[in-house]
Structures are given as structure tokens and as C-alpha cells.
């Protein structure tokens, strides 16, 4: 039990340090100790006194623990409050994790601007650090610098961190250019049913990659005599599948054509980044990508990921569900046009500014103002489609929006095996959602939300939807174990509080 306690304390200290934007060396200097001692503390391999915990908390401006048992993070939500004001959309979580994987292609220094400080990014940084990549937060913890070693140490990979993120699968594309064989832990992430790497392998086998899965590890081998002689046709127009194919093609010495490619926002951001690395990519924004690879990439690059359309949709949904007037700034409009068209059909009162460019110089942004509206259920069902259709990740938000509208709305979440089931958690808060089958939910509105205490759904977007409903419900709700939300959103509770919400973060004591 004592060892388990030290591990939990160590993780809390590590998270607080990363949130502050400090390295282990910086914390060690503030404490007057060594970096190796801080490393042992964070790994749970060092006995630590309450006095030292207090000193660390003071140095990091964070209460590491209160007296009692340290446990997962929870949210206490006082609902029924209107939001107001304006808020900027953060950079894309899905783009940032793809770009972090893409830095493995480059021998030079990479700086990524305004990187989302979320658990998914932290886990990837832990994995990168464990194999020898030097990363540090710069410019007051806003930007991220990545410098790779001459040789990666894959034997030292942090398997625990790797298994807590699905993004680790995107190491396959870059690593096949750096070594002839390697091992990679099984990917984890949020629980969205059975996932398979076969769509990835259909693309990556064309570059000579072969994988055997044994004992929780992918054992990868690369046959250098194999290369794609004809276009690669993806059997699944998935985002990470397309990204893996792009990462493999980037350092292939030749031209690679990828068909049935995703043209979603994070794929486009990755293409823009590859162009900054000197890789020419034709067809960006279409389903056919032509990649002119280069065998060696050794450049110092500075890149600004674009804003996150799914976070923008989250904030728009927060305004709708709480019947608030809210301005959401820096919205990547190209990736929300279908969603806004559906909301307009439902009766949403909103306006938008003229378009302007994101810091990457390519993505089109607008500022959106949403006002309280009397919504009607849409005539057609809500269902996702590959871009430019309604984004898969935005489907859950329509459950809360439909529950606020007059009438019945059919939501068909055909992509995932069980995400629709998690949406029925809204019934605990007064919703009227009927699960027709594992993929279809019938939502009846409007809803008089009521407060409740419940566990956080294990899938990211449904978890946020539950939080939004709690914000609309009169009374005090508790959402327990919100790690999955922290995987995809930076300081969401604090940012919603800045708009008028009342959300308290706490841990069991």
C-alpha cells in the first residue's frame, strides 16, 4: 500500500510540474536537490515526507495532496448558470499529437506553437522522453521544443504512458525509417469498442513494415527491399490511418500516392507541417494525396498548429444547452460548416465575422456569436460522415443539443461500436434518450435537466456532453474521475468558469 501511495503522489507531482511548464531540473533547482531525486520521487521510488510534499506544492504553486487518500480528479458543478463573454478556441488536440509523432521524422529542432496542454500530449511527451527525445516547454510554457537524439532508445520506452494513449500507433510511420526492428506497446486511450491496426498495416506493409503482436507488444520488422510501386488505397478513410501513411511516405525516397485519404482538419495540419519539413504534398483537402518524399529531413522548423474545431463545437454546445449568449473566437469554420447548417435548420440564432487566417497561414477562422434560441428537432437524422461531412467527434454534442430542442431527434453514431450507449448517461440528469441499438439513440426534448452524481463516461466527447448537461441542471452535480476529459481539453473547467460557470475541481480526501 505504501509503495502504491508513493506512486500516486509521484504522478500528482509530475502532473503539477508539467502544468507549471517546468522540467525536472527546474524543480530540482527550486528545491535545492538533484534532478535524479526528482525523477525518483515522480516514479514513486523515493520516500517523501509531508514537509517535502508541502515544499514541492509551494514551488509549483499547487496543492499536491490534502490530508487523506490521494485519488482521481472529480468535478463539482453548480448548474443553472448562464454563460457570457467570449473565449478563444485552443489549438487542435488531434493535430498536436500527430505533429509530435511527426517530429520523429526530423533530425533537427522543432518548435510547435501554443500546443494544447492536455493529458494526451503529456503521455506522448513521457514516451518521447523515455526513448531519448529532448522536449521542453518554452516561452512561459506556451510553446514546445522537441530535439531528437542521434539514436532512439526503444528498449527504454515508457510502456505505461504508451498504453494510455491511442496516438502511439502513429509512431509506426516515422520509426520504420529509423530502425529495422523495434517493439511498441499496445495502444490504449478512451474506450470506443474494438479497434484494429489492420487498416494501418494495409498502408504500412507497402513500405516493408511487418508486425507480430505478442505479450502486449507490437514486434515490428522492416524489409528495406519493399516500397509502394503503385498507389496505396486505404480501406478505411480514417484520420490516424491517413496520418500514418503520410508519415511513412514523408521519408520514402520517391513519390507515394494515397487514395481514399481522410481530408480532415488534423490531416491537413500534418500536411502543412510536412511541407515545412521540405516534403511536398499535393491534393491537401482532397481524398487523393501525392507525397514527394525525401530520404533525410534535418531542418530547424517552427510551426503553429491550427485551432480545434471539436473544442469549438464543445463551446457552441455549452452556449446552446445553458441558453447563453457567447462569442467563440478563432473557430476553424471550414470544419464546422455542416454542423452550423444543421443548427441553423434547428433554429439557432448566431452570426459570424469575416474570415481570417490562422497562424499557420492556411486554415480559415471566424468568430461566432451564439444567442439563446428556441430549437426544433431536425427533420433528418444526425449522423457523421468523413470530411466535409459532419465530424464524427461532434456527434455526441448533438445529443445534448437535441435534448434542448422541441421534438424527437434520431442520432445514428455508426462509426463506433458502443459510444451511443454512453450518451444514455444523460438520462441520469433528466434526459429522455432511448437506445434503439448500439449505434442509434432517439432523443426527445426539451429537457428539464436535474442534478446528479455519477461516474464520468470512459469516452472523451460523451464525458464532456455529460458535463455540459450538468452545467444546465439546477442544483449541484458531481462528475467523478474526469481523467478522460483532461486527455482532450486544456483547463476546461477553469475556462468555463471564466464565462460564468461554477465548476470546482476536487479529489477524494
Regions flagged by a language model, labelled:
Residues 1-8, 74-75:
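A detector for short, charged/polar N-terminal pre-domain segments
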Residues 11-30, 55:
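Short basic helix-loop element that most often maps to the first helix and adjoining turn
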Residues 15-16, 35-43, 47-59, 63-509:
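Short, structured segments at the rim of ligand-binding sites
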Amino acid at each position: 500500500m505504501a509503495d502504491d501511495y508513493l506512486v500516486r503522489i509521484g504522478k500528482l507531482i509530475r502532473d503539477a510540474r508539467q502544468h507549471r511548464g517546468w522540467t525536472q531540473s527546474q524543480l530540482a533547482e527550486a528545491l535545492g536537490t538533484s534532478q535524479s531525486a526528482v525523477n525518483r520521487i515522480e516514479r514513486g521510488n523515493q520516500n517523501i515526507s509531508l514537509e517535502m510534499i508541502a515544499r514541492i506544492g509551494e514551488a509549483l504553486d499547487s496543492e499536491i495532496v490534502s490530508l487523506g487518500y490521494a485519488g482521481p480528479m472529480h468535478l463539482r458543478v453548480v448548474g443553472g448558470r448562464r454563460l457570457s463573454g467570449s473565449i478563444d478556441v485552443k489549438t487542435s488536440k488531434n493535430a498536436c499529437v500527430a505533429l509530435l509523432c511527426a517530429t520523429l521524422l526530423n533530425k533537427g529542432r522543432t518548435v510547435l506553437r501554443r500546443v494544447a496542454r492536455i493529458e494526451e500530449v503529456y503521455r506522448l511527451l513521457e514516451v518521447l522522453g523515455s526513448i531519448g527525445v529532448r522536449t521542453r516547454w518554452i516561452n512561459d510554457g506556451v510553446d514546445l521544443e522537441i530535439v531528437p537524439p542521434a539514436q532512439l532508445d526503444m528498449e527504454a520506452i515508457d510502456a505505461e504512458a504508451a498504453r494510455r494513449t491511442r496516438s502511439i500507433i502513429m509512431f509506426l510511420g516515422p520509426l520504420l525509417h529509423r530502425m529495422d526492428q523495434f517493439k511498441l506497446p499496445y495502444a490504449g486511450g478512451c474506450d470506443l469498442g474494438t479497434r484494429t491496426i489492420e487498416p494501418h498495416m494495409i498502408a504500412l506493409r507497402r513500405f516493408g513494415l511487418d508486425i507480430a503482436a505478442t505479450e502486449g507488444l507490437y514486434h515490428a520488422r522492416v524489409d528495406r527491399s519493399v516500397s509502394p510501386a503503385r498507389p496505396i488505397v486505404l480501406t478505411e478513410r480514417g484520420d490516424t490511418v491517413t496520418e500514418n501513411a503520410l508519415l511513412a511516405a514523408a521519408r520514402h525516397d520517391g513519390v507515394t500516392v494515397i487514395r481514399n485519404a481522410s481530408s480532415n482538419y488534423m490531416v491537413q495540419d500534418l500536411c502543412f507541417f510536412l511541407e515545412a519539413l521540405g516534403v511536398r504534398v499535393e491534393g491537401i483537402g482532397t481524398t487523393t494525396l501525392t507525397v514527394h518524399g525525401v530520404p533525410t529531413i534535418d531542418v530547424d522548423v517552427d510551426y503553429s498548429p491550427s485551432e480545434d474545431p471539436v473544442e469549438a463545437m464543445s463551446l457552441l454546445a455549452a452556449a446552446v444547452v445553458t441558453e447563453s449568449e457567447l462569442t467563440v473566437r478563432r473557430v476553424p469554420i471550414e470544419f464546422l460548416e455542416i454542423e452550423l447548417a444543421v443548427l441553423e435548420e434547428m433554429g439557432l440564432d448566431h452570426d459570424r465575422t469575416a474570415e481570417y487566417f490562422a497562424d499557420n497561414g492556411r486554415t480559415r477562422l471566424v468568430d461566432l456569436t451564439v444567442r439563446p434560441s428556441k430549437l426544433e428537432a431536425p427533420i433528418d437524422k444526425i449522423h457523421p460522415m468523413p470530411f466535409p461531412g459532419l465530424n464524427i467527434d461532434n456527434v455526441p454534442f448533438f445529443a445534448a443539443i437535441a435534448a434542448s430542442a422541441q421534438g424527437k431527434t434520431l442520432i445514428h453514431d455508426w462509426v463506433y461500436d458502443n459510444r451511443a450507449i454512453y450518451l444514455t448517461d444523460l438520462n441520469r440528469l433528466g434526459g429522455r434518450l432511448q437506445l434503439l441499438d448500439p449505434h442509434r439513440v432517439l432523443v426527445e426534448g426539451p429537457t428539464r435537466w436535474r442534478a446528479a452524481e455519477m461516474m464520468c463516461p470512459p469516452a472523451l466527447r460523451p464525458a464532456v456532453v455529460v458535463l455540459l448537461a450538468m452545467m444546465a441542471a439546477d442544483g449541484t452535480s458531481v462528475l467523478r474521475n474526469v481523467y478522460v476529459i483532461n486527455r482532450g481539453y486544456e483547463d476546461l473547467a477553469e475556462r468555463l468558469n471564466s464565462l460564468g460557470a461554477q465548476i470546482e475541481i476536487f479529489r477524494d480526501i
